[in-house]
Amino acid sequence: MKLNKTVLAICLVSFNLHAANLVYSANQNDNTVSVVDADKYKKVGSLTLGYPAGDKRLYSPLYNGEINVHGLSYAKQRRELSVVSTVTNSVVRFDTNTGKKIDTIYVGRNPHEPRYTNNEDEIWVTVRGENYISIIDSQTGNEKKRIELESGPGMVTFSHDDKYAYISSSFDEHLWIVDTKTKKVIKKLMMPSSFSPFINTTPDGKEVWVDHKDVGEITRISTKDNEIIETFKTGKISNHFAFANNKAYVTVGGENSVNIYDYGEKHAKLIKKIQAETLPHGIWADTKGSKVYFVNELSNTLQIIDADSDKIIAKLPVGAL
């Protein structure tokens, strides 16, 4: 059985399971995770974590479901999906072979995004309502360590060798670089923004990119020396980005577009804009770099881009994003 993975947020994750290319989308307004067959462009199921927003049962003293299902991370070898719900302060893990819940882990106020280390031994969760990273042992599901920071962290990504973790902030200009072995901050970089909710590593591992949603910019960091390469303008309400076919795809909510950049040189260059629906947000590419999937927050749709032609080839409804 071969598995490949992709992740998007408000979140989307895709991977190959039993020869079906599946995409998972976290839907924060109906508290579900949509399951999409990416080859047939069809929603094939959902994982229900709670009642939808507005349902009076959410306020029951006996309610034990999740609220504001938001962040996803997938472990390829473990066949495991972690789902963060920001209001109920939880990480729910699912067995992706069966679709059954493994456990629920409570990590602290307003977690944002989970991320498995590349070796899948740990799950690092940014607890941005407080000021720390919650590190979960993926074998036991127990929290093993907290890394305290100056402010609430937004998201974490790793170098390909798992030596360093790069952590953005949701509340100030810090970006922290952490030694994953000692769990100590070894360097801090200052960003041009106090709201940097999304971060990821390029497919070749040479760079880490950080999105600055409030100012519509992205910063590129070299993983060789952990220094800033450049910060470039992307557009109002720049949400997330993905990499495919040696290009970067950025969802720009204020323009309802996906902006495509060539980043082969020192300065990223805009090469095309693709019109999206309403407020494009989460975006990720498949492992082959042939397709890019993104969700539109206000139209509750998933659209698929062919990375060769850079044209939208499919659209389908998902849950209430």
What does each model-found stretch correspond to?
Residues 1-18:
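Gram-negative bacterial Sec-dependent N-terminal signal peptides
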Residues 12, 18-321:
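Predominantly soluble domains enriched in secretory-pathway, periplasmic, or organellar proteins
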